[in-house]
Amino acid sequence: MAIVKVTDSDFDSKIESGVKLVDFWATWCGPCKMIAPVLEELAGDYDGKADILKLDVDENPSTAAKYEVMSIPTLIVFKDGEPVDKVVGFQPKENLAEVLDKHL
């Protein structure tokens, strides 16, 4: 599955079931650009097991504030609508896969 962009208005409905890795990012963020290809690979690797979502914090500040996102990129794993794990900053694919695997 491709990465899905989410907004403040549809965020809750997109995370309500299953395992989701949400990338809180911004267009001007260098590390966010570095992690983008890693997330594309994960989206392919975890197709059918977990979804990768992206939320632009500049365009959607309410959701970022709700989950206390202070630095970007912040990646939060949600399981059935609840946050279960959080990683801040660039991470290699192996680290993110390990985080996701804990919640599948």
From Swiss-Prot:
CDD domains cross-referenced by the UniProt entry: TRX_family (cd02947)
Keyword GTP-binding: no
Keyword terms: Disulfide bond, Electron transport, Redox-active center, Transport
PROSITE patterns assigned to the protein according to its UniProt record, in alphabetical order: THIOREDOXIN_1 (PS00194), THIOREDOXIN_2 (PS51352)
Disulfide bonds: C29-C32
Molecular function in Gene Ontology: protein-disulfide reductase activity
Gene3D superfamilies membership: Glutaredoxin
GO terms of biological process kind: cell redox homeostasis
Family: Belongs to the thioredoxin family.
Function: Component of the thioredoxin-thioredoxin reductase system. Participates in various redox reactions through the reversible oxidation of its active center dithiol to a disulfide and catalyzes dithiol-disulfide exchange reactions.
Name of this protein: Thioredoxin
Species in which this protein is naturally found: Staphylococcus epidermidis (strain ATCC 35984 / DSM 28319 / BCRC 17069 / CCUG 31568 / BM 3577 / RP62A)
Gene behind this protein: trxA
